[in-house]
Design a protein with these regions (language model features):
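Extended, charge-enriched "interface" segments that sit outside catalytic cores
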Residues: 1-73, 319, 327-328, 336, ...
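Conserved phosphate-coordination/catalytic loops
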Residues: 59-63, 113, 241-245
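Short, charged beta->alpha transition segments
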Residues: 67-68, 116-125, 248-251, 406-412
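Glycine-rich phosphate-binding loops that contact phosphosugars or nucleotide phosphates
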Residues: 70-237, 311, 315-320, 326-336, ...
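Catalytic nucleophile loop
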Residues: 83, 454-456
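Active-site phosphate/pyrophosphate-binding segments
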Residues: 158-313, 352, 356-450, 454, ...
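Phosphate-binding beta-loop-alpha motif at adenosine-nucleotide cofactor sites
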Residues: 268, 342-348
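Conserved catalytic block of serine-dependent lipid acyl chemistry
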Residues: 325, 460
Length: 461
């Protein structure tokens, strides 16, 4: 995979940063799991670096995963429904939308919402008798997948013998979690215990991504092979020749220079990659009043409307229908915006990109002075949710929602460098996606600011 960079006046800063990273032996220290690359305190760092060795670990599991996939097909399952949130679901969703349904394999569906209409949509699509559910939660305590499990357990028990219901469920979780205990008590077909030193958003190349991928018929061996090739190049001490370190340096330098809106543009065949990478970037760098804002899925507009707070990364799949995107990238580059172009030879290069970005983001985090492996705001959101639910339990109603003024009034206070975040707490549909895309286009063209979009409660994770 080739990488081209058009960085303009930032090229000197990036070169100096790469030289500094090399002087400080940052690449070597990351592989040595030296927490001081990020913080003096090793808390939530040294026990979160298992992704560095994930390809070695998971290559040993390929035969077992393929055997389990055959077991599932032989059992007559036609649908696989993954119940998860955030890091447990976004990687599988990218794989699902990128590779589609494979002949002779069950159809993979990912449910990472507790919106009643979305749940009904999935439930109406499947036959529970022929469905295997993957309950994916690192901690085993995540509210949404636990609620979804309880719902679908009751659905399955309504159509099969109670003693057979457990055979329709598989757990993917950390060793010793409450989900491991529950799976044993309630007769799950299988439990995949993931290495506990891999954080959720870094887990796509572990059981969390590979189990649903294998069951859906994806070539997980090819995916891991590409990931391992990237891993090897990310061990290169020379920061300039290390693709993960190089990308991370560009991200960090741009953010420190006010270009903190990393805008991912991708070929049509891999345009869902942004679902996964936006969580990786946002949750890893967005803390302590600093961070990089990932912008994925924005409609293409004329280059004149983009502000000077952008860094563009173009994920280009060779052989895809790239004419429109290529033309847009040429115009963006010609306008003086910084652009990084990453060439992919085939869709299984996603494995390499998963690892490249997992390496790049911690490098960027080190330049920003943040710990890329903790998630304080996610925990705050969970605590706030528990408080709201407690209020409902005690009073029978939720706290009143305060609505703001009009959108026009809101946008009048927007400043250069601001961005608009759109969160839709509703079922995903082509119609909604089209409407939101056009809305984003109008915001960019009228106000010249970046936009992000996601479905809730996925966006909270």
């Amino acid at each position: 995979m080739n990488t081209e960079m058009s960085l303009g006046r930032y090229l000197v800063d990036v070169a100096a940063t790469l030289a500094d990273l090399e002087k400080r032996n940052v690449v070597q220290r990351i592989w040595q799991k030296d927490h001081t690359v990020w913080k003096p305190d090793p808390t939530e760092i040294t026990n979160r670096l298992g992704w560095l060795a994930v390809t070695d670990r998971m290559q040993e599991e390929i035969a077992g995963l393929e055997a389990f996939s055959k077991e599932v097909r032989d059992a007559g399952f036609q649908y696989i429904v993954l119940l998860g949130m955030g890091g447990s679901s976004l990687g599988p969703e990218v794989l699902r939308q990128t590779f589609g349904k494979r002949d002779g394999y069950p159809e993979l569906l990912v449910l990472d919402s507790i919106d009643p209409d979305w749940i009904k949509q999935v439930q109406d699509r499947i036959d529970p008798v022929q469905t295997l559910f993957l309950v994916a939660s690192k901690s085993g305590t995540t509210i949404e997948p636990n609620l979804l499990y309880e719902h679908f357990r009751s659905v399955v028990e309504s159509v099969v013998e109670p003693q057979a219901a457990g055979g329709h469920f598989v757990a993917i979780t950390d060793p010793g979690s409450t989900l491991v205990e529950r799976a044993g008590k309630e007769g799950f077909r299988k439990v995949f215990e993931n290495p506990s030193d891999i954080g959720g958003r870094y887990s796509v190349l572990s059981f969390f991504g590979l189990v649903p991928g294998a069951l859906a018929g994806e070539d997980i061996a090819a995916l891991l092979r590409k990931a391992d090739q990237m891993k090897q190049t990310c061990t290169i001490d020379s920061a300039t020749d290390n693709p993960g370190c190089q990308l991370g340096a560009v991200m960090g330098v741009m953010a420190l220079n006010g270009r903190d809106k990393l805008t991912l543009i991708a070929s049509p065949g891999v345009n869902r990659f942004g679902l996964w990478v936006e969580q990786l970037i946002a949750e890893s760098t967005g803390k302590e009043g600093k961070g990089i804002v990932p912008v994925a899925g924005e409609p293409l507009v004329d280059s004149q409307y983009y502000g000077d707070d952008r860094l563009f990364v173009y994920l280009r799949l060779n052989g895809d229908d790239n004419n429109e995107v290529d033309a847009a990238i040429r115009a963006i580059t010609d306008s003086g915006q910084p652009v990084v172009t990453i060439e992919m030879q085939d869709k299984y290069d996603l494995g390499a990109e998963f690892f490249r970005w997992e390496f790049a983001v911690p490098v960027a985090g080190s330049l920003l002075g943040s710990n890329p492996f903790d998630q304080p705001d996610v925990q705050k959101a969970k605590e706030a949710t528990k408080k709201v639910l407690q209020v409902h339990k005690e009073t029978g109603s939720f706290p009143a929602i305060e609505t703001g003024g009009s959108l026009v009034a809101l946008m009048e206070v927007a400043k250069p460098g601001s961005y608009v975040s759109i969160m839709a707490y509703m079922v995903e549909s082509d119609e909604t996606n089209t409407l939101i895309s056009e809305f984003r286009r109008k915001l960019i063209e009228r106000y010249g600011i970046a936009t992000t979009f996601g479905y809730g409660p996925r966006v909270l994770h």
